[in-house]
Amino acid sequence: MALTPQRGSSSGLSRPELWLLLWAAAWRLGATACPALCTCTGTTVDCHGTGLQAIPKNIPRNTERLELNGNNITRIHKNDFAGLKQLRVLQLMENQIGAVERGAFDDMKELERLRLNRNQLQVLPELLFQNNQALSRLDLSENFLQAVPRKAFRGATDLKNLQLDKNRISCIEEGAFRALRGLEVLTLNNNNITTIPVSSFNHMPKLRTFRLHSNHLFCDCHLAWLSQWLRQRPTIGLFTQCSGPASLRGLNVAEVQKGEFSCSGQGEAAGAPACTLSSGSCPAMCSCSSGIVDCRGKGLTAIPANLPETMTEIRLELNGIKSIPPGAFSPYRKLRRIDLSNNQIAEIAPDAFQGLRSLNSLVLYGNKITDLPRGVFGGLYTLQLLLLNANKINCIRPDAFQDLQNLSLLSLYDNKIQSLAKGTFTSLRAIQTLHLAQNPFICDCNLKWLADFLRTNPIETTGARCASPRRLANKRIGQIKSKKFRCSAKEQYFIPGTEDYHLNSECTSDVACPHKCRCEASVVECSSLKLSKIPERIPQSTTELRLNNNEISILEATGLFKKLSHLKKINLSNNKVSEIEDGTFEGAASVSELHLTANQLESIRSGMFRGLDGLRTLMLRNNRISCIHNDSFTGLRNVRLLSLYDNHITTISPGAFDTLQALSTLNLLANPFNCNCHLSWLGDWLRKRKIVTGNPRCQNPDFLRQIPLQDVAFPDFRCEEGQEEVGCLPRPQCPQECACLDTVVRCSNKHLQALPKGIPKNVTELYLDGNQFTLVPGQLSTFKYLQLVDLSNNKISSLSNSSFTNMSQLTTLILSYNALQCIPPLAFQGLRSLRLLSLHGNDVSTLQEGIFADVTSLSHLAIGANPLYCDCRLRWLSSWVKTGYKEPGIARCAGPPEMEGKLLLTTPAKKFECQGPPSLAVQAKCDPCLSSPCQNQGTCHNDPLEVYRCTCPSGYKGRHCEVSLDGCSSNPCGNGGTCHAQEGEDAGFTCSCPSGFEGPTCGVDTDDCVKHACVNGGVCVDGVGNYTCQCPLQYTGRACEQLVDFCSPDMNPCQHEAQCVGTPDGPRCECMLGYTGDNCSENQDDCKDHKCQNGAQCVDEVNSYACLCVEGYSGQLCEIPPAPRSSCEGTECQNGANCVDQGSRPVCQCLPGFGGPECEKLLSVNFVDRDTYLQFTDLQNWPRANITLQVSTAEDNGILLYNGDNDHIAVELYQGHVRVSYDPGSYPSSAIYSAETINDGQFHTVELVTFDQMVNLSIDGGSPMTMDNFGKHYTLNSEAPLYVGGMPVDVNSAAFRLWQILNGTSFHGCIRNLYINNELQDFTKTQMKPGVVPGCEPCRKLYCLHGICQPNATPGPVCHCEAGWGGLHCDQPVDGPCHGHKCVHGKCVPLDALAYSCQCQDGYSGALCNQVGAVAEPCGGLQCLHGHCQASATKGAHCVCSPGFSGELCEQESECRGDPVRDFHRVQRGYAICQTTRPLSWVECRGACPGQGCCQGLRLKRRKLTFECSDGTSFAEEVEKPTKCGCAQCA
């Protein structure tokens, strides 16, 4: 029903009111609109992974969270986020953002979290965050930032987490972090930082995480402050190391002493080198002078940031730059010349050259540019030279050059342009030269205007020609009549075998279907076509790409998928894919299925799949993958189905699937899993997750073969000795023999004879100098990105016409100092980018004319130190090097004689004359057969690899046919044998041997021992026609048949009445006492090593000696001196102390730890074991107590004192601080912490005073910390024992559960001088557990990992190890628990890694089998199924059943029931234990069910509970617990 306001009615709306109402409704509608491609839920807008190239419009004004990650956004403009005043979280990571305009975040005053990591930022504008006071977390990691300006973070005063790692930062301005006083996390690792301004981090008192490792810190005097700063904070900044000078390289900065930070000169020491960004600076790798910045050939992959603002020319040619980001040159308004030639540039931002009003020269040739964005040359009114040749440009927009009125030279030579729209060159009013050749022009009616233009303006100087149709092919466009340019349906304009780039005038039409492929709707079918690579151009509307059943071996990172924003499915199955370059799938965020089944992948890493943010199905079946590490699937958070069926997987690293947050189906079948200790985590993981298809089974070890992996018990996952360190790590992308840095591989001086395996496919520089190569490795042609190859100082003697094929990007080739004599005419064919060629130091005499025909870019030729023969045949080379001075004036002529010593560069060409043929040696270098190297009438053939090859006539062989095949020519028959030659080319000879010899050359004596008669172990020795027997010692005779009696009277060797004993090894003499030697002939001098003391005389006796003592001495060895009366008589020193006489006064020398006049008290103890304590039981009056003790430890945590249970006092070491928890009856209990840390290894005095509800804590006499517990007065339980250094397990668990202690670790260190109420305590009156030893000093520096330290051993403190451990520190496992076992009459049987039992022999019993007679075992025949056997005097042997079971043998399981439980719910997060803040009730389901049912929860209750953790953190989480149990179908 419509309401129509009537004139004069008070309820009607006036026109202004009506407009206001309509505007408000429209505003509300706009505020709730959702941008296209995005999802809006409440105040959250999710646009991630949608292929966006710019910030979307119409973002609701009330948005609080905005997800823009995983797109293709390149620039953030000032007004992109205008009006978003309520935004709190902004996610911009994983885009291609190259610039952020200042003021872009000004409206977002509530912004708390901003992530810009994994982008392409090079410059961080100052004051970018000046209005973001609420910003607490900022992530700028993994960008290309090169500097941190002074005002970069000005205004972000609440910033707590700042991540700047993995950038290219080399400059940090002084004061850059000064405003960040609340910062807790700062990461600067993996940058190029060499120095840091003094005190840069001193204003961060809350800093708890700090990373600075993996930089290039130069440790001179300017960095000395950092060493002291790091020493004061030993837990942060770990692994921060010096990179220079050489003497300090590799040392931790914190460990370098102050005196070692030195500067070499006075100027250096005066002040640190300034790092200022106000007007830019010269990049470290470049040279700058007179306004010219020269960065040629420096290996750059991006344009340097923060360049000098006053520069007029920048040279960036011969690098590896891949893109020109937005506004790359806009700040440098004085630029007049830019040279970016010979890079890898494939993309140019539309505003890359914006604002360069003075630019007159722009050089972009030799790149990979395919498209010129609209307006890329806009505003370049002064440009005169534009070189775009040697790219892949396929389309030019008609207005591409509209602002270039002053352009005089335009080169579009060597591109892929098929047509040009009419009017493309209309605005070029000053054009004088135009290069259009080497483009596949289609000369149809659309190109008629160009022919007319070129006839009117004859400025095209390269001879542009038509490529099609056939009737006009190869004809000059400017010379064809206009009427010939026509369009006809009968003619074919597309050139078969090439890509079709025939786009419309706006360059926006989708490309045609790839050659040979079929395109239906949005499906591109390219299967079974024997393709070796993915087609370069695919329609942008493609949703499914089928490339299965081809021969693709490498997936290259070409950026293809960045343009396919609608692609959903890629099928690459049944190819030969063995390598996927990192970044291949960049921009493929829309792809949900990727099939790589039946390929040859051996390993996988996360970089292979980077960009596949929306992937849900990943098929990797039937490959050769052997190992899955925890970086394999990073970033694939949306994958639901992962198939690894039928690979070679033997192990999987823990956490390998943690990043697959959405994973619901995993196929691991048909893999040869090695179920050792490295796979122990997987069984439990499979049981918990229940997402695995089938049951993957173990293949190794043998005893687990074919057992389902999830059924293997945890102890059975074990490693043999030596396998513990073998894990699953990503294969390094560098050969073992080489060193790699980015795309540079250095394999110099490694004695290599072949190319090493594992060279990265994207290598750009390869150094193989100083090795043993004899040929150019054929595999070099597979590395198509090579720009430099160094093969100098090898043994290469020849080149072939295919030595350097497929190296179109090669710019430098070094072949100096080899053995080259001749170079084939086509050796350098296809090297169009080659600029430097070194042939220096070879044996080349001549080069054929035209050898450098393809090397059109060559500017430097090194051919010195070669014997050049300068006749008329080399005249062309002299003229060639003179044009452009390509040779530096080093090469000299070696002949003919009249030209000897003359320079190739400066000698006039007319001097190069022929006066006859050159010498045979010169000619033979390229025609080696001229020198007739083959002997004995052999035929010579030129060979490209072996220089020449001889075909030998019958009867000869060898390289030069120098070896005769007459076998008898060398008199091969020995020992008088006669030689008989055999006929034929490969025939040999035979020998007629004399009697007694045999063999092919009569060299074998006939074996006469075949039928020997030697007996009794005699050894037959062959002679010429006879043999002899070598008899054992006790036999004689010709055949060793007679036994020798060595003990007969005439042969007995024993003397001095020694007894002779015959043995199989001969006679043995048993000597009388006092004699020695083999035959007892030597009289033994017993005084030789006598022990007589104090000048006593030794008297030799029979088999002994006696000592004659000096007067006053006594004892068997005269060791007892005359004894004076000692003052120690009657003095009783206790606890093993010795009494010494000091000034006629007895003094007890106490052992370590004891004190008192008679060493009667134990005052200091050392806790050397991890689980031990002391217990006092007779202490009183706790509510009012004064406790003092001294503590020394290097540990972070440990219990010092504990008394009580519910009402308690607890003193513990927590993270280095002393924590006191005190509960005299009030609730809740309270705790205080010391400000000081005491875990520095020194002794510290801890004083504690309790007075009813008040506690005072003081460290080393400092200011006390006070705590008041207000509440009812209550006296603590004085009967509870006082525990020192730890407590029993049950007390520990109870105290931990009630939060009375935060860390249950026992104390490890030293405690001494414990005073309670001013009374020094005696530790001997305590219950002392093993592992506590007297004294502090001896055991303080000896840590026994699995044992106890004994401080008073003879050699000093020693470790007594637990069973199964050994070594100085009890840290080395011994060979099993049975090593050194104590079984007397029995066999040692291992129970586990550390324990064993004794299996007694018949007739023995006891734990060690040391008791005679077997003891009857009452439980021997009783098998309790669910319980244990117990024997008693009344019942005898009977079963004690486990809960839930009954019956005589505990065989009956109780019916299903629910046992009520009320307790805290606990979980573990990392190293922290977390429990709910209040207890909750639930039931535990136990018992059996009839049939196949299971006892389980029938009714579940879900509650959201708050957890508090032992590390101080808290969180809320939903918990589901059963409230009713019953029988149901098993899950």
UniProtKB/Swiss-Prot annotation:
GO MF entries: calcium ion binding; heparan sulfate proteoglycan binding; Roundabout binding; signaling receptor binding
InterPro entries: ConA-like_dom_sf (IPR013320), Cys-rich_flank_reg_C (IPR000483), Cys_knot_C (IPR006207), EGF-like_Ca-bd_dom (IPR001881), EGF-like_CS (IPR013032), EGF-like_dom (IPR000742), EGF-type_Asp/Asn_hydroxyl_site (IPR000152), EGF_Ca-bd_CS (IPR018097)
Deleted gene: phenotype: Mice show significant axon guidance errors in a variety of pathways, including corticofugal, callosal and thalamocortical tracts. Mice double-deficient in SLIT1 and SLIT2 show retinal axon guidance defects and a disorganized lateral olfactory tract (LOT).
Disulfide cysteine pairs (residue numbers): C286-C295, C443-C466, C445-C487, C513-C519, C517-C526, C675-C698, C677-C719, C929-C940, C934-C950, C952-C961, C968-C979, C973-C991, C993-C1002, C1009-C1020, C1014-C1029, C1031-C1040, C1047-C1060, C1054-C1069, C1071-C1080, C1087-C1098, C1092-C1107, C1109-C1118, C1128-C1139, C1133-C1148, C1150-C1159, C1310-C1336, C1339-C1349, C1344-C1359, C1361-C1370, C1378-C1388, C1383-C1398, C1400-C1409, C1419-C1429, C1424-C1439, C1441-C1450, C1456-C1495, C1474-C1509, C1485-C1525, C1489-C1527
A biological-process GO annotation: tangential migration from the subventricular zone to the olfactory bulb
Domain Laminin G-like: 1163-1336
Source superkingdom: Eukaryota
GO-annotated cellular components: extracellular space; plasma membrane
Annotated LRRNT domain residues: 34-61, 273-309, 504-540, 725-761
Domain annotation CTCK: ranges: 1456-1531
UniProt keyword list: Developmental protein, Differentiation, Disulfide bond, EGF-like domain, Glycoprotein, Leucine-rich repeat, Neurogenesis, Repeat, Secreted, Signal
LRRCT domain: residues covered: 215-265, 439-489, 671-721, 866-916
EGF-like domain location: 927-962, 964-1003, 1005-1041, 1043-1081, 1083-1119, 1124-1160, 1337-1371, 1374-1410, 1415-1451
Signal peptide (residue range): 1-33
LRR repeats: 62-83, 86-107, 110-131, 134-155, 158-179, 182-203, 310-331, 334-355, 358-379, 382-403, 406-427, 541-562, 566-587, 590-611, 614-635, 638-659, 762-783, 785-806, 809-830, 833-854
Subcellular location: Secreted
Subunit structure: Interacts with GREM1 and ROBO1.
PANTHER family for the chain: SLIT HOMOLOG, SLIT HOMOLOG 1 PROTEIN
Function: Thought to act as molecular guidance cue in cellular migration, and function appears to be mediated by interaction with roundabout homolog receptors. During neural development involved in axonal navigation at the ventral midline of the neural tube and projection of axons to different regions. SLIT1 and SLIT2 together seem to be essential for midline guidance in the forebrain by acting as repulsive signal preventing inappropriate midline crossing by axons projecting from the olfactory bulb.
Protein name (Swiss-Prot/TrEMBL): Slit homolog 1 protein
Native organism: Mus musculus (Mouse)
Encoding gene, per UniProt annotation: Slit1
